[in-house]
């Protein structure tokens, strides 16, 4: 299944002008129609002859291309969305062969449909908008080329391949310290939004502590910001890829034919429908910030860099069982926090041994001024692990770490060296301790410990959001709101016939709820599905939305509610819609409340037997859609 960015398609369309600017609007419409005509011709040529490299290139030297197509506002972003790439020193856009032909066809169809609507005068002047994260740049230029950023003199004098790899991994993290890249990384993170969410969670936790509901120590806002950062990164910024979709059928079940190298990049070549597709396994952060896709290695690499962009002391962690994640130092807790960005997990280090049943032997963490053998944090059977470590002697390991550590710290100040030495000492003491795994670590769950769930607002969360009428809704005597679990976005809209105008949007399911208890959004990466469910190990989950029109003279005339649910086995979901002003019926009430309760189910996955708004991640439908008429 191939999805397209409709916002990019709509962004190039003319904007509605005031009555005195009708002539200017006609000119904009003509420019739009001509630009789309040219682009449609280009896309048709690619679809007709996909192997012809000439048709895959858009050159700026062409006068029509430059003056009629590329001059249209939003065109460059649309080309990028389709899959075109422009090198920094080139005057041409090229469409790589790994871009799916099905994707090109979908953009062609969407553009053709919108152009026809503009020609016939049947277009909605305010097409539905998609909520997106920050715009993906076509190219990011670092201060120094990747291979020079990771090139350092070797200090190890050993023939042991495993120990040599430790120095290579240590050199690789130095690519994060490029000032231009760090500045670019900061611009890609919605820092204000994430900080606001973290602050709201902190206030909620403070209230829980004050009421006696919570006994744990109050967390700091930087730790809560980290929780929001990894959730945003996992659900909105980065995309998991098993295989690049087939260019013919769009399937991701293609077969690996071979692995090859193009320069410094490892490339997986897969085949389906007789066509080869290439999956580039980028290590260069400047390329990952553009592609924003990969597997656990790319996830950890990019996320660790973004932590550095926000000035966290972060390090990338490589395990010998072929998994990669991040550790971030918490100044407030004075310890390193385990963060797995590909799993959206925080502070569950024993889950690999006990939940995933992985054999632990070597796990190393690398940062700009340190290297640490953190194997002992990820196991609670140290004696057994010692007998499994056969790749080098323990004394040789310590000597290697000391040599690499000295290499990384040679430019550190005396104060920094002292701080790092003291921190290392405390960490080593902590690593010697063994503890019992939590329930979540035993089951390998991705929701983290209860403490972190509360910090994420996923235990009990009262947002106190109430839907009141805006000026437009008051004038039109209607309130319409819908929610997409695929994009995790609410939209308020006005409706006239079949024409819809988006009035406002709210990102994340929590943003427009009144309250919830034991509810979280589950994303199934393997099945490409998303839904709201109750937390694991809870008997009941509840979520509510509130609508209040009491400050106006209007009451509910009628309403229509689409509210999709899915149950399995003994799972039960009850949905009630009740007036909030004491009225017997919602009709003629000045407000009402929608409440969904999730209960039942059997076994360890009982929580999964009750689901709200389940849909494909590629779906553009709205499994929650409320339309209220007022009088």
From Swiss-Prot:
UniProt record, GO biological process: glycoprotein catabolic process; positive regulation of BMP signaling pathway; visceral mesoderm-endoderm interaction involved in midgut development
EC class: hydrolase
Pfam families: PAW, PUB, Transglut_core
Active site: 296 (nucleophile), 323, 340
Entry-linked SMART domains: PAW, PUG, TGc
Key word NAD present: no
Keywords carried by this UniProt record: Cytoplasm, Hydrolase, Metal-binding, Phosphoprotein, Zinc
Alphabetized InterPro entries for the sequence: Galactose-bd-like_sf, Papain-like_cys_pep_sf, PAW_sf, Peptide_N_glycanase_PAW_dom, PNGase, PUB-like_dom_sf, PUB_domain, Transglutaminase-like
Amino acids binding Zn(2+): 246, 249, 272-273
Domain of life: Eukaryota
Alphabetical list of CDD domains matching this protein: PUB
Gene3D superfamilies per the UniProt record, alphabetical: 1.20.58.2190, 2.20.25.10, 3.10.620.30, Peptide N glycanase, PAW domain
SUPFAM superfamilies (alphabetical): Cysteine proteinases, Galactose-binding domain-like, PUG domain-like
UniProt GO MF annotations: metal ion binding; peptide-N4-(N-acetyl-beta-glucosaminyl)asparagine amidase activity
Cofactor field: Zn(2+)
Cross-referenced PROSITE patterns: PAW
Entry's cofactor comment: Binds 1 zinc ion per subunit.
Domain PUB: start-end pairs: 34-97
Keyword Disulfide bond carried by entry: no
Cell compartments where the protein resides: Cytoplasm
Residue ranges of domain PAW in the record: 441-631
EC number from the UniProt entry: 3.5.1.52
Function (record text): Specifically deglycosylates the denatured form of N-linked glycoproteins in the cytoplasm and assists their proteasome-mediated degradation. Cleaves the beta-aspartyl-glucosamine (GlcNAc) of the glycan and the amide side chain of Asn, converting Asn to Asp. Prefers proteins containing high-mannose over those bearing complex type oligosaccharides. Can recognize misfolded proteins in the endoplasmic reticulum that are exported to the cytosol to be destroyed and deglycosylate them, while it has no activity toward native proteins.
Record family assignment: Belongs to the transglutaminase-like superfamily. PNGase family.
The name this protein goes by in its record: Peptide-N(4)-(N-acetyl-beta-glucosaminyl)asparagine amidase
Source organism (scientific name): Drosophila melanogaster (Fruit fly)
């Amino acid at each position: 299944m191939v999805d397209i960015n409709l916002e990019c398609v709509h962004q190039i369309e003319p904007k509605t002008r005031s009555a005195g600017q009708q002539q200017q609007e006609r000119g904009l419409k003509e420019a739009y129609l001509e630009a789309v005509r040219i682009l449609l011709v280009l896309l048709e040529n690619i679809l007709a002859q996909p192997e012809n490299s000439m048709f895959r290139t858009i050159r700026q030297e062409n006068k029509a291309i430059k003056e009629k197509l590329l001059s249209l506002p939003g065109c460059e972003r649309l080309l990028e969305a389709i899959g075109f790439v422009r090198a920094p020193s080139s005057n041409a856009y090229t469409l790589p062969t790994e871009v799916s032909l099905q994707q090109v066809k979908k953009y062609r169809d969407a553009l053709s449909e919108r152009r026809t609507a503009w020609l016939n005068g049947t277009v909605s002047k305010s097409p539905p908008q998609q909520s997106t994260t920050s715009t993906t740049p076509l190219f990011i230029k670092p201060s120094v080329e990747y291979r020079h950023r990771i090139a350092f003199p070797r200090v190890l004098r050993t023939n042991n391949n495993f120990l040599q790899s430790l120095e290579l991994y240590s050199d690789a993290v130095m690519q994060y310290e490029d000032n231009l890249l760090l500045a670019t990384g900061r611009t890609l993170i919605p820092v204000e939004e994430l900080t606001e969410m973290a602050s709201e969670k902190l206030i909620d936790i403070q209230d829980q502590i004050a009421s006696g509901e919570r006994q744990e120590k109050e967390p700091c806002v930087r730790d809560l910001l980290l929780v929001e950062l990894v959730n945003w990164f996992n659900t909105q910024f980065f995309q998991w890829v098993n295989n690049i979709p087939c260019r013919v059928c769009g399937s991701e079940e293609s077969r690996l034919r071979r692995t090859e190298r193009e320069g410094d990049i490892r490339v997986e070549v897969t085949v389906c429908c007789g066509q080869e597709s290439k999956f580039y396994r980028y290590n260069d952060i400047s390329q990952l910030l553009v592609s924003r896709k990969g597997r656990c290695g790319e996830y950890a690499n990019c996320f660790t860099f973004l932590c550095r962009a926000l000035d966290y002391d972060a390090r990338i962690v490589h395990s010998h069982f072929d998994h990669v994640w991040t550790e971030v130092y918490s100044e407030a807790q004075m310890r390193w926090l385990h963060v797995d960005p590909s799993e959206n997990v925080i502070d569950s280090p024993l889950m690999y041994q006990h939940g995933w049943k992985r054999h632990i032997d070597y796990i190393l963490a690398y940062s700009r001024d340190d290297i640490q053998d953190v194997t002992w944090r990820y196991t609670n059977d140290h004696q057994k692990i010692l007998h499994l470590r056969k790749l080098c002697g323990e004394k040789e390991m310590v000597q290697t770490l000391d040599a690499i550590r000295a290499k990384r710290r040679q430019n550190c100040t005396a104060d920094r060296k002292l701080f790092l030495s003291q921190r290392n000492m405390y960490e080593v003491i902590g690593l010697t301790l063994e503890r019992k795994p939590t329930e979540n670590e035993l089951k390998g769950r991705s929701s983290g410990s209860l403490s972190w769930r509360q910090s994420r607002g996923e235990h009990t969360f009262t947002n106190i959001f109430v839907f009141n009428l805006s000026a437009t809704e008051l004038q039109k005597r209607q309130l319409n709101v819908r929610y997409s679990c695929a994009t995790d976005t609410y939209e308020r809209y006005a409706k006239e016939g079949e024409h819809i105008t988006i009035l406002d949007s709210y990102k994340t399911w929590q943003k427009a709820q009144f309250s919830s208890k034991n509810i979280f959004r589950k994303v199934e990466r393997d099945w490409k599905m998303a839904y709201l469910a109750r937390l694991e190990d809870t008997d009941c989950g509840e979520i509510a939305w509130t609508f209040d029109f009491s400050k106006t003279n209007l009451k509910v005339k009628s309403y229509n509610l689409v509210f999709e649910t899915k149950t399995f086995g003994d799972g039960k979901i009850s949905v009630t819609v009740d007036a909030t002003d004491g009225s017997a019926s919602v009709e003629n009430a000045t407000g009402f409340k929608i409440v969904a309760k999730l209960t039942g189910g059997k076994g360890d996955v009982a929580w999964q037997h009750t689901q709200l708004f389940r849909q494909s991640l590629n779906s553009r439908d709205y499994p929650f859609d409320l339309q209220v008429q007022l009088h």
